[in-house]
Amino acid sequence: MALSTMIYNHLPTTSQPIMNKLPKIHGLAHQQVVRDPPQTKTSNRVSSLTESLSHLLHLHLETPPRTNIHQINWNLYGEEKLSTPTTSPKEVIAQNWHDMHASSNWESLLDPLHTWLRREIIKYGEFAQATYDAFDFDSHSEYCGSCRYNRHKLFETLGLSRNGYKVSKYIYAMSHVNMPQWLQRSKLAETWSKDSNWMGYVGVSDDEETRRIGRRDIVVAWRGTVAPTEWYEDLQRKLEPTGHGDAKVEHGFLSIYTSKNDSTRYNKSSASEQVMKEVTRLVELYREKGEEVSLTITGHSLGGALALLNAYEAASTIPNLPVSVISFGAPRVGNIAFRDELHQLGVKTLRVVIKQDVVPWMPGLVFNESLQKLDDITGTLGWVYTHVGAELKLDVRSSPYLKRGLNWLGFHSLETYLHLVDGFVNTTSTFREEARRDVALVNKACDMLVDELRIPHCWYQLANKGLVCNAHGRWVKPKRDPEDIPSPHMQENINVPALEAGIQTQDVLKPLYSV
């Protein structure tokens, strides 16, 4: 079965008494802006891998009986949902933010999934989704590989302006790494950059959101790229030392994170150097004001891997900074020593995974953390990949809105993840009937929704696929607004007073996310 080559795409454990302190709540999602779907191509290896991988990983792709799923009257569904708001008030979680930020590794908060934590997971998932929704996938555009909008317009354009955060800096990574299918390049000779891709952003909570969540939260969102086929084909499965003890990480991930070249416009400094410079600046800025500061890093797929590398560096560099990672469909990144160092540094990691998604099984499809049971015989194996942190495992079969059968792209889609988080209560219950997040978002870049919903697949795109009719009646690609054209000078010269003014707002924040 053919696959698309591209995908659109911290809380400690607490005791039961903590659960009793955290009241239950309800909430919902927001609307987003359109963008071009990524280009697709087929892989000759997919059909040969499908059956063997599904059997090997026990992905449970068969259609189960629907006796455990609440029945839906599809004739009434549309009318009922159209009259139901997709938002709800945000609760003040300031007194419990340490629990929501993994002071106890989210114990007693994941199964059943606490309502407040569900909201926070989806919030950070939406931050990661923004890196796909704003990305220019169009290989016929001179701006392919860049963000469509400047950082001041990003959240507003995507419908995220009321989430309580402002973007302070964009992150760029080298596109000439050793995994050619992982990053996007324009087919045109004259482009905004021949060497770099937009890989995410750094943001910070405004005053109103800071009061609600109990601290000044810095967020870093990393963009993912490839579909499951390229994970299998392109991963070099080569562990490389991080420079600290015995810790090693996958070579390709480290290359994207650390590569730079003085001859480039956007990567005279690496993605690592860019993000750490900005995070350090923000931490110092708000600590000088006497504020408590946290760092939350998020990403999907490849973005989840980069988030873990970023967390490792931040925790190693900035003393006493609470660092958490919330990742979606992320692969294994490093060896056991890398995992242990993250633990010693105090990094809290929550991995959201879908049982049928193959990417979290890679690299280390066969040789992974399961071999630790042999440590008494073999000793610690430094070449074995291992996952990090707590896991929230989801199942596509739990949702009555999702099709059954094999769909690698849909299983790995971030929107599928967010839909399942919104409906998850615990491992034994059915899909949450009161879930309000718009199910249409699932089909933004895949074909996962049941036909009864009448939502077209891959519907999320620019009007007329980005073409406009000019004064002469000809359909052409429009020029970007000058402020949306990537500029390394605009990127480097951040107006700090303007940023501070931008995050001081007295507007009452209205909810954008589901719970």
Outline where the language-model segments fall:
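Gly/Ala-rich beta-loop-alpha elbow adjacent to hydrolase catalytic centers
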Residues: G299-G303, A307
